[in-house]
């Protein structure tokens, strides 16, 4: 992250204020303040991750994934025989915190801040699937988009999507 000395001073002051405003996270803010003030390049890369960016296209794809899971669960609940498909298979897991943290952060933002998909169960891990999911979700989306009635899926269509 490239910053001028003036920008570093401003950010350092912000962290100093946050230390006073949020004592529970004071150590974290003091650490970040030290990194900024001293210009530790390796540790400043952490800020790049914190101040990362998701493109509009990526955000829309994540919403599409969440919408697909909404459709899967609604369709599953409307089946005459729900025993044929385990409910866990149509439950949104989220993304891997280790490799897909930005996607996971966006999911948490959508649910906890925006109030969308609040019926999704965050589980004990807060939508941390603990395994990379992006490619799996892409395959599932391709199958779901090919279905003529995306919100009235048959058991066969549900199985095709979750097994993609």
Swiss-Prot record:
An example Pfam family from this entry, by short name, is: YfbU
* Entry superkingdom: Bacteria
Q: What InterPro entries does the record point to?
A: UPF0304_YfbU, YfbU_alpha-helical_sf, YfbU_helix-hairpin_sf
Family, similarity comment = Belongs to the UPF0304 family.
Per its UniProt record, what HAMAP family does this chain match? UPF0304 (MF_00762)
NCBIfam families recorded for this chain?
A: PRK05445.1 (NF003936)
- What's the protein called, per UniProt? UPF0304 protein YfbU
């Amino acid at each position: 992250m490239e910053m001028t000395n003036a920008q570093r001073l401003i950010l350092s002051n912000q962290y100093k204020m946050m230390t006073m405003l949020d004592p529970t996270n004071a150590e974290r803010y003091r650490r970040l303040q030290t990194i900024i003030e001293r210009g530790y390049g390796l540790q400043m890369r952490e800020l790049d991750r914190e101040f990362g960016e998701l493109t509009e296209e990526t955000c829309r794809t994540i919403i599409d994934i969440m919408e697909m899971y909404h459709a899967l669960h609604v369709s599953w609940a409307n089946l005459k025989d729900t025993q044929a498909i385990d409910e866990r298979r149509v439950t949104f897991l989220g993304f891997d915190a280790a490799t897909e943290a930005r996607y996971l952060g966006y999911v948490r933002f959508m649910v906890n801040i925006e109030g969308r998909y609040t019926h999704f169960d965050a589980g004990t891990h807060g939508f941390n699937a603990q395994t990379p999911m992006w490619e799996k979700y892409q395959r599932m989306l391709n199958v779901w988009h090919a279905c003529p009635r995306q919100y009235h899926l048959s058991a066969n269509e549900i199985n095709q999507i979750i097994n993609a």
